[in-house]
Amino acid sequence: MRLTVFLSLFLGVMVFGAFDQEAFLFVQHLTSENFESALNMCSNQVKAQLSVQSLSNIWNSLKAQLSDFREIAGYEKIIQAEYEIYNFTLKFDRGEISALVTMDREGKVAGLFFKQATKTEYELPDYVDPESFEEKDITVNGLPGKITIPKGSGPFPAVVLVHGSGPNDMDETIGPNKIFKDIAYGLSSKGIIVLRYHKRTFVEKVDPTTLTVEKEVIEDALEAVKILKERKDVSRVYVLGHSLGAMLTPEIAERSKADGVVMIAPPARPLEEVMEDQLKYLQSLGLASNVEETLNILEKLKRKEIPPDEFVLGAPAKYFYDLRERDPASIAKRLTIPMLLIFGGRDYQVTEKDQEIWLKELSGRENVKILVFDDLNHLMISGEGKSTPVEYMKKGHVDKRVIDEIARWMVK
């Protein structure tokens, strides 16, 4: 089975229209196989035609064709007379399918239909100049990757991109958004070599009971830094991490002797504490279920009351204990290399609590820069109002200000 660590951090969701939230919750119930809750959201007419068992049969037939479900990869809304139709793209191990959910005026599910998904093409952000760099295939410890190289004689500064939690591809695709592709193309348009690669848990069938942070993230990141250091067209090497990847970049930089670190939305607290705050936030918006049960598990993890090999919240308990021992702020404090930290003011996953820890440990140092963009969310995409996981289903791009700040900082 593929490992999907339970990190709402890393759950994804959008500021809703009329029934966006209800439609998304219905699909969440369906994809998490909570068929009774899904049926309860349906209109009386639909309930007369469907049962819990029939919903289960429909879902299992999809899995039989497409293997394990992975994520909700995006959606669009269509208004049709008195109905709102939501087209959700569902990603499985062996392909994608569209789930069309029809909502009536009362916010009840009035229809459900599945069809083959149509693939959407990646659109270049305005800040990308595709003529200014070239992209080549590369492998990192056997993992497929890409390296984008500016045109010209060089040498150039270079950076390795380290993913957030879960089985991410090289583009760090979240819904319809490709965070690392935006960053790679944006930075290479400004004279920086960028190396990105598929995360090991994206490529391999991993036994989650044997998973470690070292094997999942750090080993491959160290190899990626080594690859860049051996290139003649590279002047210096940076490590850039997002979310959980940002949490680990100080250790990766220290062990690889990198020349600098960029941390985008880096947690500073233990994972259980970050998840607890996320869960309570989502509960306040009506977007979380089984809250008390999950909070109880998180509390036990904090006290290390769960046996290390016991599987909880998508990972063995020892995975959480391992992360807890890696204190990123303390490691960063002893580093002497330049560091750039970027936060989104609308980020509900990595919050002011984390910012305050980083500020306490690193403020006052001339080679450390900390930026907060008030309108950006966890993905560094701009928006308004409260951020939710469904926001991540809306197509956008990493904000130009983030790209510009990173490029200026690396090139100077």
From Swiss-Prot:
Changing residue 378 to N: Loss of enzymatic activity. InterPro entries: AB_hydrolase_Est10 (IPR053145), AB_hydrolase_fold (IPR029058), DUF3887 (IPR024981), Esterase_EstD (IPR054995), Hydrolase_4 (IPR022742). It comes from the Bacteria. The high thermal stability and activity in the presence of organic solvents makes EstD an attractive catalyst for future applications in industry. It holds the Pfam family DUF3887. It is an enzyme of class 3 (hydrolase). Changing residue 347 to N: Loss of enzymatic activity. Keywords: Hydrolase, Serine esterase, Signal. The keyword ATP-binding does not apply. Optimum temperature is around 95 degrees Celsius. Shows >70% of its maximal activity in the pH range of 5-9. Displays a relatively high thermostability with a half-life of 1 hour at 100 degrees Celsius. The keyword Transmembrane helix does not apply. Residues 1-20 form the signal peptide. GO terms for molecular function: carboxylesterase activity; carboxylic ester hydrolase activity. Optimum pH is 7. The active site is at residues 243, 347, 378. Is strongly inhibited by phenylmethylsulfonyl fluoride, a serine protease inhibitor, and by mercury chloride. Diethyl pyrocarbonate, a histidine modifier, also inhibits the reaction, albeit less pronounced than phenylmethylsulfonyl fluoride. EDTA and dithiothreitol have no effect on enzyme activity. It catalyses: a carboxylic ester + H2O = an alcohol + a carboxylate + H(+). SUPFAM superfamilies: alpha/beta-Hydrolases. Exists mainly as a monomer and, to some extent as a dimer. Exhibits significant esterase activity with a preference for short acyl chain esters (C4-C8) in vitro. Its physiological function is not known. Displays neither proteolytic activity using casein as substrate, nor peptidase activity when assayed with L-leucine p-nitroanilide and L-proline p-nitroanilide. Belongs to the AB hydrolase superfamily. Esterase 10 family. This is Esterase EstD. It comes from Thermotoga maritima (strain ATCC 43589 / DSM 3109 / JCM 10099 / NBRC 100826 / MSB8). The gene is estD.
